[in-house]
Amino acid sequence: MKIDMRNISKSFGTNKVLEKIDLELQSGQIHALMGENGAGKSTLMNILTGLFPASTGTIYIDGEERTFSNPQEAEEFGISFIHQEMNTWPEMTVLENLFLGREIKTTFGLLNQKLMRQKALETFKRLGVTIPLDIPIGNLSVGQQQMIEIAKSLLNQLSILVMDEPTAALTDRETENLFRVIRGLKQEGVGVVYISHRMEEIFKITDFVTVMRDGVIVDTKETSLTNSDELVKKMVGRKLEDYYPEKHSEIGPVAFEVSNLCGDNFEDVSFYVRKGEILGFSGLMGAGRTEVMRTIFGIDKKKSGKVKIDDQEITITTPSQAIKQGIGFLTENRKDEGLILDFNIKDNMTLPSTKDFSKHGFFDEKTSTTFVQQLINRLYIKSGRPDLEVGNLSGGNQQKVVLAKWIGIAPKVLILDEPTRGVDVGAKREIYQLMNELADRGVPIVMVSSDLPEILGVSDRIMVMHEGRISGELSRKEADQEKVMQLATGGK
């Protein structure tokens, strides 16, 4: 299959996101699509797969003009799109999610459970994973859910597979399994569009790379004929001399302390964070880092343990109590827990601080709009309009909206779970700079990250977890990748 996208433009109201795009895709090739968040990568692929139409332009498939009315039509034609955010039903089982809308039936019209199970297990085997078929998908980790999304697409007869940040929530082993599958698909003649910000993956797996910036294509070339410095410069329009901005904040006394905390999947977790300090939490997927943070914030139930702010013990059983105590929490899954996608930017940003903008029972629209506009400008959110629906923003700009929401409460402590997941290199640096600015003001920050270079580049101290327990603590000076991984795998 050969796809030619010609003169594709797209606007949402007055917001132009694509302008005169020409792109060729070919079966049997792995084609990287790179660019900062907001460059238009996902929008272009959404047009290809029928989620919404182009404002102008034409799509040719094997020389014939063709458009799809919805993603289902595209899938039936052999073009599938695995989105960055999960497209699953948490209450339904793994098997039900896999075959939703594509159920296999017997000659009597009944569900052919045996054949569906067989196909599901065969697909999981190709991916190199073992996941129970009869448990609710909501009980699985983000990484496992991502693997199911990938498996779902593999159940189709594929010609072109579009993958948007497919490894963002995967372990190293799962990533290697994915690469094996992608290489196998290529050998079978399937074309893969690989949207990613991870340079090492681009050079490891792709044949061609296209760079987008501000809704236009900057360049397309064979991956082997370019390098990471050139790609970064083309993505952001400048060279990133220093990936992690230098931190100048003075670290003060202990401001946030957790003692002997126990909950689901973790026990006896103790740590502290000082004013102006960024404390990194590292560990393999399933180590319990996210569960600890969710318990502190009152999402998950605490079994035992104490939490203190400024040496005062606090009681938290719900997120609303955590917010009242001054705790902000950016969750790892922004779509389901961090944002209301149908709401606009202003409504999302002011959700935790509504009372601050209310006087005598009335919401102060003028003050809140001014406040939100200041945050939009400060975080370089690409829209410029507080009334723009959050669902129309790129993943990176959505992440900035979640950050702005918690900055708005003037937090006493800020917990960030995978703050730069799915975010491009330019936006990552902006987020790191914002973290440094907050630390300069004395805000203690806890950062959970699966990105080891990020942990090493941003953290003042590093806590490492293994199988639900703290396995070690490292200072910034003594930490390196080998020491962190040794602790993360249970070594000493």
UniProtKB/Swiss-Prot annotation:
Annotated transmembrane regions: none
Alphabetized UniProt keyword annotations: ATP-binding, Cell membrane, Membrane, Nucleotide-binding, Repeat, Sugar transport, Translocase, Transport
Superkingdom in the source lineage: Bacteria
PROSITE patterns per the UniProt record, alphabetical: ABC_TRANSPORTER_1, ABC_TRANSPORTER_2, RBSA
Pfam families membership: ABC_tran (PF00005)
Chain sites annotated for binding ATP: G35, E36, N37, G38, A39, G40, K41, S42
Coiled coil (UniProt feature): none
InterPro entries in UniProt: AAA+_ATPase, ABC_carbohydrate_import_ATPase, ABC_transporter-like_ATP-bd, ABC_transporter-like_CS, P-loop_NTPase
Compartments where found: Cell membrane
Residues covered by the ABC transporter domain: 3-239, 238-492
Top EC class for this record: translocase
Main location: membrane
Catalytic activity: D-ribose(out) + ATP + H2O = D-ribose(in) + ADP + phosphate + H(+)
Membrane topology, record value: Peripheral membrane protein
GO annotations of cellular component type: plasma membrane
Single GO MF annotation: ATP binding
Stored Gene3D superfamilies: P-loop containing nucleotide triphosphate hydrolases
Record EC number: 7.5.2.7
Described function: Part of the ABC transporter complex RbsABC involved in ribose import. Responsible for energy coupling to the transport system.
Family classification: Belongs to the ABC transporter superfamily. Ribose importer (TC 3.A.1.2.1) family.
Subunit note: The complex is composed of an ATP-binding protein (RbsA), two transmembrane proteins (RbsC) and a solute-binding protein (RbsB).
UniProt name for this protein: Ribose import ATP-binding protein RbsA
Gene label: rbsA
